[in-house]
Design a protein with these regions (language model features):
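Conserved, structured core segments of small domains
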Residues: 1-116
Length: 116
């Protein structure tokens, strides 16, 4: 069994507004997905992210830290959340990614986690 991180990227400009029926439908879809992941014993961690404007990037060059508000790349899709799941192999990770609601209209990027 290996752990994988699932990074959910979506178009923030198309994200439903707080309190809208569309957002409630998305919340319901993620709750159903989370229930399925937990029932399978695959869930380790996961949470949504705040809007991209709340994020920041830090880089260090020549010993000097530079902090930039907002997403690292202005035109990039929004990293709106993540899951860490235990999967028996890549095929199972691909199956969970395909079921993730963010993959339907967005992208779920999957990385195996290197255990040290």
């Amino acid at each position: 069994m290996a752990s994988y991180i699932f990074l959910q990227y979506v178009d923030e400009s198309k994200a439903p507004k707080w309190g809208s029926p569309e957002l409630n439908a998305q919340i319901d879809a993620f709750a159903k997905y989370l229930d399925e992941v937990k029932a399978a014993g695959a869930f380790k961690d996961g949470d949504p992210c705040q809007p991209s404007a709340a994020g920041f990037s830090v880089s260090v060059r020549d010993g000097q830290a530079k902090t930039t508000d907002g997403p690292m790349h202005a035109q990039s899709p929004w990293l709106n959340g993540y899951f860490v799941l235990d999967c028996k192999d890549r095929a199972e990770a691909e199956a969970w990614a395909a079921k993730n609601p963010a993959a339907h209209g967005g992208t779920v990027e999957v990385h195996p986690i290197l255990s040290l």
